[in-house]
């Protein structure tokens, strides 16, 4: 579990995250963190948070968001809200590091998801795109199914297809989650 003031870094995506308020701080109501995204930083691809709303408040720099087919460019002082269930992705839209305050409502296990992605990146268990390698993706998708899913194919199809690979990964000693002390910045 993450703690307030903890900072993690994902060297593949270019994300540096400082947890401001965790699920424990807010009784699960929200997770709040400050995201610094390097000039070439981006999330691995389009995704959906089935049960969570994400609120992005740009503090410095420029961010580019895709919400469905809609492109939004947000600069310092602007906010973008992604409703639960909405396909989206984001990237730094400028030449300088962007700084964004992010709120995720409700928190669920999003902080654990973020810590896990950082650890996977540090351990070389992700592809160049930032997506976990298949064996780790199978575990990740099953573990964090309330927090994130691919926009297509339908979630039940993905779960069914990855179940055998997840079982194999567990049999080989791989974990779906990582320690409470993830890659520090």
Please provide the spans of the model-predicted regions.
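Jelly-roll (double-stranded beta-helix
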Residues: 1-30, 41-52, 57, 62-185
């Amino acid at each position: 579990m993450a703690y307030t003031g903890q900072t993690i870094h994902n060297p593949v995506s270019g994300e540096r995250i400082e947890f401001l308020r965790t699920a424990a701080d807010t009784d699960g109501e929200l997770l709040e963190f400050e995201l610094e995204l390097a000039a070439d930083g981006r999330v691995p691809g389009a995704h959906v948070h089935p049960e969570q709303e994400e609120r992005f408040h740009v503090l410095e720099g420029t961010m580019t968001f895709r919400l469905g087919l809609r492109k939004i460019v947000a600069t310092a002082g602007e906010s973008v809200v992604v409703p639960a269930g909405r396909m989206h992705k984001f990237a730094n839209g400028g030449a300088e590091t962007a700084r964004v305050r992010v709120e995720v409502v409700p928190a669920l296990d999003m902080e654990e998801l973020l810590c896990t992605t950082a650890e996977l990146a540090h351990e070389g268990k992700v592809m160049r795109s930032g997506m976990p390698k298949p064996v780790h993706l199978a575990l990740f998708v099953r573990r964090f199914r309330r927090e994130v899913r691919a926009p297509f194919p339908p979630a039940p199809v993905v779960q069914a297809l990855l179940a055998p690979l997840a079982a194999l990964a567990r049999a080989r000693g791989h974990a779906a989650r990582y320690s409470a002390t993830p890659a520090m910045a």
